[in-house]
C-alpha cells in the first residue's frame, strides 16, 4: 500500500508538471483600474518558478552563485538569488544528466527539471510514513498519514514544479524521523550524525530551514525534562554537525551581504511586495487575519494554483457558499482535533514534534505580520507531523477499523484532486490570452 501511495504521488505530480505552463507570460483575469488595461503577468505557472529556473540557468552559465542586488534593474527575474545553493546545484546536475537545453527555456526543458522535485516529493511521502512509525503509530495509522502528502493537491503541484520547496520538505521530514527515533528509542551516534547532516542540508536548501534546529533543541530539552540518560547529548551533536555543514554558506553571506541569512538584501528587495500594514489599514486588523490570511491559507493548504489565482472551484468559496475546500478542511480539522486528544501529553516525541510544528506556525504568522504572504506552502515544512496528527485522530475515531478513516481521508483528498483535473488546466488556458473586449 505504501508503494501504491508513492506511485500515485509520482503519477499525479507528473500530471501537474505536464499541464502547468513553464516560463510563460500571460494575463490576470482582472483590469487595472488606473490604466483600464488587463493586468499582464510575467509568468502564469508555478509560484516563483521563473526565478528559480533563472538561478539554475545562471549557475550553469557562469559556474558561480548569484548575488541578490536590490537595485538590479532585472530584479523581477532574479529575486531568488539570495537562496542557499543546494537545490540549484542538484538541479544543474540533473539538467546535465537529462541532457536538458542549458537555456532552460522550453516547456520540455521545464518538464525534465520538474521531475527532480517529483522524486523529492516521493521521499516526503515515505518519510511521513516513517515518522508515524517512529512515534510508534500502527501500520494502518502510518499509511493514513502517508496518504496526505501523497494525494494533497497543493503538495502534488509543488512536487510538479521547479523550486527548492520539495527538497526542503523531504529533508526536514527525514530529520524529524531521526529526531523522533532518537527521542523515543535513544540517541546513538549514527542517529545523531544523520539528523545533523539532514538539518545542515536543509539549511543549505532554504533559509527558513533554520527552524529544524529548533526541533533538535526541543529534543535536547526533552532529555533533561524527562530525565532520560543517553538522550541528552545526541541532539546537541546533531546541532553541531548541522551548524558545521551550513556555516560555510552563512560565512559567505556575511562577506557578501553583511549578515548570514541575507535578510537585509531580502528586505530591501521585497519592499514592493504587498505589505501587511497596508492591507490592515485597508480592511482592518481582524478582517486581515480572518478573511485574508485565514481564508487564503486554509484554501491553499488544500490547493490554489498558478500565482494563488486558480481555485478548485469558480470562486474558491469567496462567495460564502459551501465548496469542496470546506469539505476537505472539515475532514482534516476533525482528524487534527481528535489527534490532539489521542496523543499522550507525556510522550516526549509528540511534544517535540508539536513544538516544532508550533514554531513553523509562529514563523508564518511573523512573516505575515510584515508581508501578506498567506500561502500554506510556508507551513509544509511541518506537513509530515501534521499528517501524522490527522491520521492518529482518524484512527482513534475509527478504532474498530470499519474503514471510516480511509473513506474520510479519501474524500478529503480525492474530491479536490478531481476538481483540479477539471479546473486547473482551464484556469491556465484562460490566462494565456487576453480577455476579449465587449
Where are these regions (language model features)?
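Membrane-interface transmembrane helices that cradle and orient dolichyl/undecaprenyl
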Residues: 135-136, 175-194, 202, 224
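Transmembrane-helix signature of polytopic, membrane-embedded enzymes
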Residues: 101-107, 128-151, 169-170
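Transmembrane alpha-helix segments characteristic
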Residues: 143-144, 344-366
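Transmembrane-helix motifs of polytopic, lipid-linked glycan transferases
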Residues: 111-136, 174, 338
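Perimembrane helix-loop-helix junctions
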Residues: 181, 212-243, 250
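Hydrophobic, aromatic-rich transmembrane alpha-helices
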Residues: 302-350, 407
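Start-transfer (signal-anchor) and selected internal transmembrane alpha helices
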Residues: 1-36, 125, 224-225, 233-241, ...
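Membrane-interface alpha helices of multi-pass inner-membrane proteins
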Residues: 191-207, 213, 241-244
